[in-house]
């Protein structure tokens, strides 16, 4: 199976650094780790997918785990938008699709007995816009055009991609339910330090500064946010990488309509342009007459949208989609937007650490370990966050074993 250039570079960096596991090892990592020393206290920074899976597996291994999360919810960039929509409709702010070859994502979906459903509809036609032309195509033609445009295998056959019934954030909430009070929400980190005996984190909770100590720390905070934390416990090389890692913009605009007027024209609400924008209809298999069309703008177009005020984003998108689908303006009820550069606890959608820096970026420093989609070959996917979290579980368990022998 073909891989992306980005995945090739990341995999090469992992091999050179000898600081990670290959994908087949990651798939079995949880089954091969055995607690071989007394349980240690592990402090995990961030309750996104990497932090959650690490906390879940370390807890099963018998370690004493605490998670600090700045937000008031789990999931990080896996979040389902339900407000301000009517009739229980929803759409995704972040991760939405599960390619068929993302084995770790499927593993935990199955473990938590979460139902899946197709991401793309098999009926009606999608739209393809290319060099000024407009063409109606069946969904397989739509996904073929998308794959051709990006120039690489997107992860199996897109028409076989799935989504989690009820919303993507059902998965992080399943992790969080099992971790319970181990997660401390509303607790942003302000300082990370360590010495030969322990690691320490200073954080805020209810406006008051507090300190926690641990045998090991797993930091899953995006580098775009971590660069604003006092990193006294890290090397100058690591701090330089954190400071210079680039995060891309992604912007999404959602339009709720009274009726799914596009279906009257034989369209399923999905469209692909030759530029940096996809159009999805996440409500195609949600009940009721109302629907949501959403634009998914990637770097380039996303920065332009982010600079607009929210009402301008909605108005501009309504005009664009109205021209594409027709009849949309009369059916429009309300809109919403999500621009990840503006998100206080993400400051971007996904990261590019860079080939020359990747080995140093993923390497632990003393008692402090690192994980997240930004430190994975599967950048921007739930699969990436999960795989990096499991890598960190392996690292921490090995660290504990070594320490026990000293």
Locations of regions flagged by a protein language model:
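Flavin (primarily FAD) binding-site architecture
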Residues: 219-236
């Amino acid at each position: 199976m073909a891989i992306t250039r980005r995945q090739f570079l990341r995999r090469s960096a992992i091999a050179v650094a000898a600081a990670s596991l290959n994908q087949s090892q990651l798939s079995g990592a949880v089954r091969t780790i055995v607690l071989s020393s007394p349980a240690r206290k592990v402090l995990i920074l961030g309750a996104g997918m990497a932090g959650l899976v690490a906390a879940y597996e370390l807890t099963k291994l018998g370690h004493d785990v605490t998670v600090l999360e700045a937000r008031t919810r789990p999931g990080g960039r896996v979040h389902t938008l339900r407000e301000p929509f009517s009739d229980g409709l929803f759409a995704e702010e972040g991760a939405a699709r599960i390619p068929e070859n993302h084995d770790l994502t499927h593993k935990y979906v199955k473990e938590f007995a979460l139902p899946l459903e197709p991401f793309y509809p098999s009926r009606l036609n999608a739209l393809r816009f290319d060099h000024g032309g407009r063409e109606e195509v069946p969904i397989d033609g739509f996904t073929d055009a998308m794959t051709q445009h990006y120039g690489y295998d997107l992860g199996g056959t897109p028409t076989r991609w799935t989504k989690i019934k009820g919303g993507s954030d059902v998965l992080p909430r399943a992790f969080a339910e099992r971790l319970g009070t181990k997660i401390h929400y509303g607790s942003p980190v302000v300082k990370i330090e360590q010495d030969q005996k322990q690691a320490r984190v200073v954080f805020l909770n209810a406006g008051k500064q507090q300190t926690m100590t641990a045998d090991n720390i797993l930091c899953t905070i995006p580098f775009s946010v971590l660069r604003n934390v006092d990193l006294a416990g890290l090397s100058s090389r690591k701090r330089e990488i954190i400071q210079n890692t680039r995060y891309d913009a992604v912007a999404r605009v959602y339009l709720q309509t009274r009726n799914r007027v596009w279906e009257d024209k034989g369209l399923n609400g999905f469209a692909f342009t030759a530029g940096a924008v996809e159009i999805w209809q996440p409500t195609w298999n949600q009940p009721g007459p109302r629907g949501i069309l959403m634009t998914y703008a990637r770097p380039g177009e996303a920065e332009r949208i982010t600079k607009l005020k929210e009402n301008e984003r909605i108005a501009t998108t309504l005009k664009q989609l109205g021209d594409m689908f027709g009849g949309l303006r009369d059916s429009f009820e309300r809109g919403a937007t999500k621009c990840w550069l503006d998100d206080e606890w993400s400051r971007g959608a996904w990261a590019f650490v860079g080939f020359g820096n990747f080995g140093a970026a993923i390497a632990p420093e003393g008692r402090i370990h690192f994980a997240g989609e930004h430190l994975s070959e599967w950048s921007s996917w739930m699969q990436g966050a999960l795989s990096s979290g499991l890598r960190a579980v392996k690292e921490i368990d090995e660290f504990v074993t070594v320490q026990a022998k000293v």
